């Protein structure tokens, strides 16, 4: 509705910064798929305990110049079935993206999946506790973070990848010779 995270991130156009007057948990009713550019989600503006997104994933798709800061994503497997096994955060074919101070956990497939991005930064974040025995069609899964087919520079620094079975993180599949800075 009016003034919501979804309205600001999906329906508005042009450069914008989303700020929060309240803190709390946003129970998504569907995935938050962001296909707009020039967006900052400033979670640090929320008072008190900050902002948590739960029940559905955050998906950046063909976006550019996006900054997301100080946000928690707790996917979980509520209302999920075997063919619906998302990651907490997916970033597909985006450029100039910064994820900063993100805490993500309880992904059905994994915590984070990035593919085909240019100038991507993940910093000061915690990705942990993917669900191992959940509703994933392959059975036990619990992957952490995957950075696939980067097209250009990628910076992954000062992060914690923990308490998942695999991909702590996995980087690969590039068709070019990008620079990777991993700390």
Question: How does the language model describe each region?
Answer:
Residues 2, 6-14, 26-42, 50-70, ...:
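Extracellular beta-strand-rich solenoid/capping regions of secreted or surface-exposed proteins
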Residues 21, 54, 171-172:
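Short His-Asn-centered micro-motif
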Residues 38, 43, 64-75, 93-106, ...:
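Right-handed parallel beta-helix
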């Amino acid at each position: 509705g009016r003034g919501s995270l979804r309205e600001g991130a999906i329906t508005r156009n042009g450069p914008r910064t989303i700020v929060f007057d309240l803190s709390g948990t946003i129970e998504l009713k569907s995935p938050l798929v962001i296909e707009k550019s020039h967006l900052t989600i400033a979670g640090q503006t929320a008072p008190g305990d900050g902002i948590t997104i739960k029940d559905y994933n955050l998906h950046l798709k063909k976006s550019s110049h996006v900054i997301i800061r100080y946000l928690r994503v707790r996917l979980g497997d509520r209302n999920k079935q075997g063919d619906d096994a998302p990651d907490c955060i997916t970033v597909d074919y985006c450029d100039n993206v910064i994820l900063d101070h993100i805490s993500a956990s309880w992904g059905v497939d994994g915590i984070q999946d990035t593919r085909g991005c240019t100038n991507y930064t993940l910093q000061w974040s915690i990705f942990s506790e993917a669900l191992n025995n959940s509703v994933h069609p392959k059975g036990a899964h619990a992957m952490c973070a995957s950075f696939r087919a980067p097209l250009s520079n990628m910076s992954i620094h000062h992060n914690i990848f923990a308490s998942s079975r695999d991909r702590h993180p996995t980087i690969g599949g590039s068709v070019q010779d990008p620079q990777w800075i991993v700390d």
